[in-house]
């Protein structure tokens, strides 16, 4: 058998190869005029991949299905079980290449619905699983600013973006059912109605820097325990 040189390259140390990083977001979700429908998974992938590059942890890829609260209607989503099945597939393959611990970088609020199932998945697959949630008011200033930094925001369409009748999902301002059912969503929508949506590259860079550092720190903590 070929000897794999675990200590090669710019990595924290060879223990980092036992840690796998997965991106979780959504692929089919309206984000107004400025942002694409797969904004969440692109942001999650950017954060997860950069944390992997900085540490040497294995970037295992992206989860394709996503889920959402029933009362939030701004995209096409899947069942919680479908996400868990996809994670089983990814994690089992990760185990075959030496991964023992999983960090999920999630950038879609609806996916927090899977968290209560992760302990059972850990026991079933005999791995450690931890989810880091990095979410924003939907399609609003923070998300648009992050999107501008990573190159996915079409800022020329910002004025159109805040037409809440045409794009009710922006800030969830026009998603009446979601606002009725969730006071946090309603509060965020009120703030967007009042303040609008702005593009702030400095804010976007700061959010990304802090998010990547958060994942890197978690990887470092896991290595320190090994």
UniProtKB/Swiss-Prot annotation:
Pfam families hit by this protein: Creatininase
Binding-site list for Fe cation 1: 29, 40, 108
GO biological process, one term: F420-0 metabolic process
GO MF annotation terms: 2-amino-5-formylamino-6-(5-phosphoribosylamino)pyrimidin-4(3H)-one formate-lyase activity; ferrous iron binding
UniProt KW keywords: Hydrolase, Iron, Metal-binding, Zinc
Cystine pairings recorded for this chain: none
Classification via InterPro entries: Creatininase-like_sf (IPR024087), Creatininase/forma_Hydrolase (IPR003785), FAPy_deformylase (IPR024901)
Keyword Zinc attached: yes
Binding site for Fe cation 2: 31, 40
Catalytic activity: 2-amino-5-formylamino-6-(5-phospho-D-ribosylamino)pyrimidin-4(3H)-one + H2O = 2,5-diamino-6-(1-D-ribosylamino)pyrimidin-4(3H)-one 5'-phosphate + formate + H(+)
Domain of life: Archaea
Cofactor binding note of this UniProt entry: Requires one Fe(2+) ion for activity.
Cofactor(s) annotated in UniProt: Fe(2+); Zn(2+)
Documented EC number(s): 3.5.1.102
Pathway: Cofactor biosynthesis; coenzyme F420 biosynthesis; Cofactor biosynthesis; riboflavin biosynthesis
Biological role stated in the UniProt entry: Catalyzes the hydrolysis of the formamide of 2-amino-5-formylamino-6-ribosylamino-4(3H)-pyrimidinone 5'-monophosphate (FAPy) to form 2,5-diamino-6-ribosylamino-4(3H)-pyrimidinone 5'-phosphate (APy).
HAMAP family (alphabetical): FAPy_deform
Record note on quaternary structure: Homodimer.
Family (UniProt): Belongs to the creatininase superfamily. FAPy deformylase family.
Protein name per UniProt: 2-amino-5-formylamino-6-ribosylaminopyrimidin-4(3H)-one 5'-monophosphate deformylase
